[in-house]
From Swiss-Prot:
<keyword id="KW-0949">S-adenosyl-L-methionine</keyword>
<dbReference type="GO" id="GO:0032259">
    <property type="term" value="P:methylation"/>
</dbReference>
<keyword id="KW-0808">Transferase</keyword>
<keyword id="KW-0963">Cytoplasm</keyword>
<dbReference type="Pfam" id="PF06325">
    <property type="entry name" value="PrmA"/>
</dbReference>
<feature type="binding site">
    <location>
        <position position="166"/>
    </location>
    <ligand>
        <name>S-adenosyl-L-methionine</name>
    </ligand>
</feature>
<dbReference type="InterPro" id="IPR029063">
    <property type="entry name" value="SAM-dependent_MTases_sf"/>
</dbReference>
<dbReference type="InterPro" id="IPR004498">
    <property type="entry name" value="Ribosomal_PrmA_MeTrfase"/>
</dbReference>
<feature type="binding site">
    <location>
        <position position="145"/>
    </location>
    <ligand>
        <name>S-adenosyl-L-methionine</name>
    </ligand>
</feature>
<dbReference type="InterPro" id="IPR050078">
    <property type="entry name" value="Ribosomal_L11_MeTrfase_PrmA"/>
</dbReference>
<dbReference type="GO" id="GO:0016279">
    <property type="term" value="F:protein-lysine N-methyltransferase activity"/>
</dbReference>
<feature type="binding site">
    <location>
        <position position="230"/>
    </location>
    <ligand>
        <name>S-adenosyl-L-methionine</name>
    </ligand>
</feature>
<protein>
    <recommendedName>
        <fullName>Ribosomal protein L11 methyltransferase</fullName>
        <ecNumber>2.1.1.-</ecNumber>
    </recommendedName>
</protein>
<comment type="similarity">
    <text>Belongs to the methyltransferase superfamily. PrmA family.</text>
</comment>
<dbReference type="GO" id="GO:0005829">
    <property type="term" value="C:cytosol"/>
</dbReference>
<feature type="binding site">
    <location>
        <position position="188"/>
    </location>
    <ligand>
        <name>S-adenosyl-L-methionine</name>
    </ligand>
</feature>
<comment type="function">
    <text>Methylates ribosomal protein L11.</text>
</comment>
């Protein structure tokens, strides 16, 4: 069945109100899109901010008459009679198949591949991690995840113990194990992330080598040869003493989730405990690495 799509250009202040009104008018779904390619990098705790220029996209059944809805919207003082909008017919598709077709195996470094389960592994002799996109966690497509995967691929992890601080989907933890790590400990504040990491470890036959903890449950004496933390600048700074304590003398560190302009400050801060390397960059994001003093 085809659908009718209504797109309305507005701002972050009015988007929720318009969304509620369109649902009352019979919309079957509402999504918000960025109107001017303005990224939101690090929202405050508990916030789910919208872009200043927001596009409200409403989907209606094909036989819906939108004329009364448009007339109603014209009466809203914050939109006005000549508000910017677009109506178009959307063909029916197998949206699941369309979504799946967008994901392909990706190589990181020389050895490592991240492969969706429905795709054929390009190189059976490579280090292959089977991971499906899902939840709100890393799949390798984000620059910070890619930077961390490339770094792990560059290391000899044979018989090393690794900590994945902020493990999310478990992509870094599972990759480290597939690359030869003896044991990995994953830590995350979100129980859903713990479950996702567990499921992905089981899928890749490394669950028996992965220990997972919420922060309050992590062992007090936990230490590792390698620690990777792909979180954000604020938590990286706040958790720096704990992260440093978790790395053995001479151990290796990688930090990501940082914007380019945040990298130098975080590097300087961590230099209390680590000999820090030059930052690596991908798009607007950075990765810091260092060796424990």
């Amino acid at each position: 069945m085809p659908w009718i799509q209504l797109r309305i250009n507005t701002n972050s202040d009015d988007a929720e109100t318009i969304s509620d009104l369109l649902m009352e008018e019979g919309a079957v779904s509402i999504t918000f899109e960025d109107g001017k390619d303005t990224p939101i990098f690090e929202p405050k705790l508990g916030e789910t901010p919208l872009w200043q220029d927001t596009v409200v996209v409403a989907l209606f059944e094909a036989d819906t008459d939108l004329a009364p809805t448009i007339e109603m919207l014209k009466t809203l003082p914050f939109l006005g009679e000549h508000f910017s909008h677009k109506i178009e017919q959307i063909e029916d598709k197998d949206w699941v198949r369309e979504w799946m077709d967008n994901y392909h195996p990706i190589q990181f470094g020389k050895r490592l591949w991240i492969c969706p389960s429905w795709r054929e592994v390009p190189d059976p002799s490579a280090v292959n991690v089977i991971l499906d996109p899902g939840l709100a966690f890393g799949t390798g497509t984000h620059p910070t995840t890619a930077l961390c995967l490339e770094w792990l691929d560059s290391l000899d992890l044979s018989n090393e113990e690794v900590i994945d601080f902020g493990c999310g989907s478990g992509i870094l933890a599972v990759a480290a194990l597939k690359l030869g790590a003896k044991k990995v400990t994953g830590i995350d504040i979100d129980y859903q992330a713990i479950e996702a990491s567990k499921a992905n470890a089981e899928r890749n036959d490394v669950a028996d080598q992965l220990a997972l903890y919420l922060p309050e449950d992590q062992p007090a004496d936990l230490k590792a040869d390698v620690l990777v933390a792909n979180i954000l600048a604020g938590p990286l700074r706040e958790l720096a003493p704990l992260i440093a304590e978790r790395v053995k003398s001479g151990g290796k560190l990688a930090l990501s989730g940082l914007l380019k302009e945040q990298a130098q400050e975080i590097s300087d801060f961590y230099s209390q405990w680590f000999d820090m390397d030059e930052a690596a960059h991908k798009e607007d994001w950075s990765r810091l690495t260092g060796k424990r003093k």
